[in-house]
């Protein structure tokens, strides 16, 4: 066995012009020559290696596409490690991605991510750590609030029934029954999707706990409300969600997550404080990503811009790149990956993009002129909302389906406000609800409030604020999920970098992180992961 120090010396010499073979390694004269050369060249090699690393840090051109949490975290990490030629291109006129706080009424509202869990899969949440270390920023823990279930048909909803069903549902969300099926060798294929799982298991619980037909019907309605709550987080019908999402990526938020009364976008200040305006450019939608050229296969490097690795924006500007970190939302990749990348992405990666689901959580806020507490004493969860004969329904493919207010999960007063209500919707029809005219939406939610509160004097809102993730060309949706055609393997395939020797095209974003999949923590850690991949490449390269 060759001594490690001698082995390193041999490797250094082989790159200095010496060609050692197994035969002359054990030749005494050769070893004497080698020994003298090592002493003279080791310090020179160290200096040369250090110079090469510093040169790489100064000259390596890195383009980050997208200034959401993944892109900003990647850029921050690269700049901290000295890679000064890093630039971030953002298509919209703002940075932050799904972190989007708006001043509305007397408070700040979140059109994207809202709550920050302290832990993700048992580990500290990196966004929580950022907020915790932000000096002078007011943070609060969400207080546990018991929503008041109100049946629009006047039926009484017993609190003890709500408490029991809520506890049972939390167990289902943690995959409690799925785990039992796996341990017992049960057939998971009969469940097929999350809704099938929820319905199958909840029916067993309802049948066992409530023999009375009326109570059984009410219990089903409460369960249905909780199903819609789960659906509202992902922004899709649960029939589309793979059962693996329950077992691999817990969706339910903690009982007391953290929130920022002055807007979660304060976290962006920490990420951008050392990124200059030249390095963070907004209003730069990307039209083409040339991630591989003929020179990668041994051909001479071409002076023509279109034959170099580069990112081309729709305004005509070109950015040369040694490495490209793509943090485009999954919705954009689904619609444009076939035309964005040159050459085309490998079939395996395109298949992963197609397989993964992308939901559209809808956020709706209403502002009132006078304090809400005059007529709303607690958060409301409506049950049994019916379609009135004079009220328009949601139209899907030319058919009238149902009133959108039947999708309302909860109506709640924002904890930092006296004048703003949040309307939480779930179950489906997210894209259709997002496109409803303002007047229709305001009239129907006011009618629902008056019905639930038995109060025809509930005022009309003064203003409306809502999200538009599915109709924004730069997002085309809001959150990834495991569809029934996808699995954790698709997340791994999407995250794999491309490039024969160097990692040329890298992928980050909440859809590329198994740990924290679909969360802002997953977005941040994925950006750091890909930045570190580039850093590691150059640190290792200096010894090659």
From Swiss-Prot:
The keyword Cell wall biogenesis/degradation does not apply. Keywords: Cytoplasm. The keyword Cytoplasm applies. GO terms for molecular function: polyamine oxidase activity. It is found in: Cytoplasm. InterPro entries: Amino_oxidase (IPR002937), FAD/NAD-bd_sf (IPR036188), Flavin_monoamine_oxidase (IPR050281). GO terms for cellular component: cytoplasm. Has a non-vital function. This is Protein anon-37Cs. It comes from Drosophila lebanonensis.
């Amino acid at each position: 066995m060759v001594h490690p120090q001698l082995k390193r010396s041999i490797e250094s010499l082989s790159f200095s012009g010496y060609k050692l073979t197994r035969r002359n390694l054990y030749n005494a004269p050769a070893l004497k020559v080698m020994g003298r050369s090592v002493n003279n060249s080791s310090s020179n090699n160290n200096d040369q290696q250090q110079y090469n690393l510093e040169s790489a840090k100064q000259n390596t051109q890195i383009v980050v596409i997208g200034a959401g949490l993944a892109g900003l975290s990647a850029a921050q990490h690269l700049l901290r490690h000295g890679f000064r030629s890093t630039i971030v291109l953002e298509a919209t006129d703002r940075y932050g991605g799904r972190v989007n706080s708006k001043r509305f009424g007397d408070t700040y509202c979140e059109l994207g991510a809202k709550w920050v869990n302290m832990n993700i899969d048992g580990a500290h949440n990196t966004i929580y750590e950022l907020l915790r270390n932000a000096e002078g920023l007011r943070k609060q823990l969400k207080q546990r609030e018991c929503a008041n279930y109100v049946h629009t048909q006047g039926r009484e909803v017993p609190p003890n029934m709500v408490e029991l069903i809520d506890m049972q549902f939390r167990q289902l969300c943690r995959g409690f029954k799925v785990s039992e099926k796996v341990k017992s060798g049960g057939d998971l294929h009969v469940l097929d999707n999350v809704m099938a799982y929820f319905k199958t298991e909840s029916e067993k619980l309802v049948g066992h706990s409530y023999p009375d037909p009326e109570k059984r019907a009410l219990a089903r309605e409460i369960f249905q409300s909780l199903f819609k709550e789960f659906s509202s987080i992902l922004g899709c019908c649960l029939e589309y969600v793979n059962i693996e999402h329950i077992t691999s990526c817990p969706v339910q938020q903690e009982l007391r997550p953290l929130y920022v009364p002055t807007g979660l976008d304060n976290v962006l200040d920490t990420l951008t404080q050392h990124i200059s305006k030249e390095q963070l450019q907004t209003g730069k939608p990307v039209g083409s990503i040339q991630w591989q050229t003929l020179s990668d296969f041994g051909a001479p490097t071409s002076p023509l811009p279109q034959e170099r690795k580069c990112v081309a924006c729709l305004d005509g500007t070109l950015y040369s790149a040694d490495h490209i970190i793509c943090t485009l939302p999954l919705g954009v990749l689904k619609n444009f990956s076939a035309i964005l990348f040159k050459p085309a992405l490998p079939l395996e990666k395109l298949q992963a993009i197609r397989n993964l689901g992308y939901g559209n959580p809808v956020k709706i806020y209403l502002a009132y002129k006078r304090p809400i507490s005059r007529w709303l004493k607690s958060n409301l969860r409506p049950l049994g909302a019916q379609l009135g004969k004079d009220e328009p329904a949601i139209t899907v493919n030319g058919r009238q389906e149902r009133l959108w207010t039947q999708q309302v999960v909860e109506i709640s007063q924002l904890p930092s406000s006296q004048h703003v209500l949040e309307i939480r919707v779930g179950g489906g029809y997210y894209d259709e609800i997002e496109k409803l005219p303002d007047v229709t939406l305001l009239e129907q939610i006011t009618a629902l409030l008056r019905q639930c509160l038995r109060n025809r004097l509930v005022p009309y809102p003064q203003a409306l604020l809502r999200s538009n993730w599915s109709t924004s060309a730069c997002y085309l949706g809001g959150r990834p999920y495991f569809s029934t055609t996808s699995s954790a393997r698709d997340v791994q395939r999407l995250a794999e970098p491309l490039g024969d020797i160097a990692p040329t095209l890298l992928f980050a974003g909440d859809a590329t992180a198994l740990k924290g999949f679909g969360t802002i923590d997953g977005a941040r850690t994925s950006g750091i992961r890909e930045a570190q991949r580039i850093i590691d490449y150059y640190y290792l390269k200096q010894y090659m």
